[in-house]
Amino acid sequence: MADVNKVVLAYSGGLDTSVILKWLQDTYNCEVVTFTADLGQGEEVEPARAKAQAMGVKEIYIDDLREEFVRDFVFPMFRANTVYEGEYLLGTSIARPLIAKRLIEIANETGADAISHGATGKGNDQVRFELGAYALKPGVKVIAPWREWDLLSREKLMDYAEKHNIPIERHGKKKSPYSMDANLLHISYEGGVLEDTWTEHEEDMWRWTKSPEDAPNVATYLELTYRNGDIVALDGVEMTPATVLATLNRIGGENGIGRLDIVENRYVGMKSRGCYETPGGTIMLRAHRAIESITLDREVAHLKDELMAKYASLIYTGYWWSPERLMLQQMIDASQAHVNGVVRLKLYKGNVIVTGRKSDDSLFDANIATFEDDAGAYDQADAAGFIKLNALRMRIAANKGRKLF
């Protein structure tokens, strides 16, 4: 094995990363620093400290990154109305660049010459972690155990843990049949019965949201206040970014909002089925498009929509720290200078319905758009010349005998 003196491990305290911790110590004979991120996944992160200490780890980092995650990653992404392949709100993808950033920061702080993660060799996360790491620290060594070892099943991992006295419970509360990932933006489910694309997901799989059928029979109204494209208040109460998202998750979940069952194209080449709960993000996307509808110039809005697919792909495939993503972000952020105002929404049984939008920066002029007498604000006779000029190229083609069908 290559010389490694100290490695920073992205550590959850679960089976996989606990085995990786011991495997790194034995295989590389190196010191391991553990890093556990609180991204709002809803699980207690402190037990990871005790587990790491029990395995001889001296430097343990447990960081609350919830505000940074939403402020510097989720909100910038939503300024672009980002959706991958028309549906996926990128809840897993957008968390990886922050984890990579913090891994490198800790490596620099502790003098570590390597980082390690628990992503498998089949998925997108290995790419996301490592592209970010190399962008931020080109000379860092990355250790990806799933690409090196032969512990390729859960049973083998359990046997390894038992053999090496790793503090993992073999018997305890029932384990979910799904591979799950959660943060403040979403929770995902993969594997198990979902690997059959014809099998319907089970109702008891969902953890954050009520079934739309069981959601309240009375609609919930709320108002979101925007400043420069970001939500700053809910029902007039100013909130931090993480509090905004957590509150929308709760309200959206109660109203059956944000469930998704999709098959997506992974960067590594395969198709993968996943189920997602993104209640707050679903509300945010609808509301942001609503406030932009009255504050953005038409051509700016259309250009943003054209760029969004590329921007979404960059995030999905792990290029958050790339120069092209940073360039696009500057354009997107510049477009948000006048995206200010309030959006009123009605939430009802899985639906997010826009019922109002207002802004001091609104480009909607009722005097011009009215169906009533506009008192000369718009001269309808001007439309004749506009239409003739725009039809000119088609008239020329027709006069040349070009056939359309």
Swiss-Prot record:
Keywords: Amino-acid biosynthesis, Arginine biosynthesis, ATP-binding, Cytoplasm, Ligase, Nucleotide-binding. ATP binds at A10, Y11, S12, G13, G14, L15, D16, T17, S18, A37, G118. L-citrulline binds at Y88, S93, N124, R128, S179, S188, E264, Y276. L-aspartate binds at T120, N124, D125. It is found in: Cytoplasm. Pathway: Amino-acid biosynthesis; L-arginine biosynthesis; L-arginine from L-ornithine and carbamoyl phosphate: step 2/3. GO terms for cellular component: cytoplasm. Signal peptide: none annotated. Belongs to the argininosuccinate synthase family. Type 1 subfamily. This is Argininosuccinate synthase. It comes from Pseudomonas savastanoi pv. phaseolicola (strain 1448A / Race 6). The gene is argG.
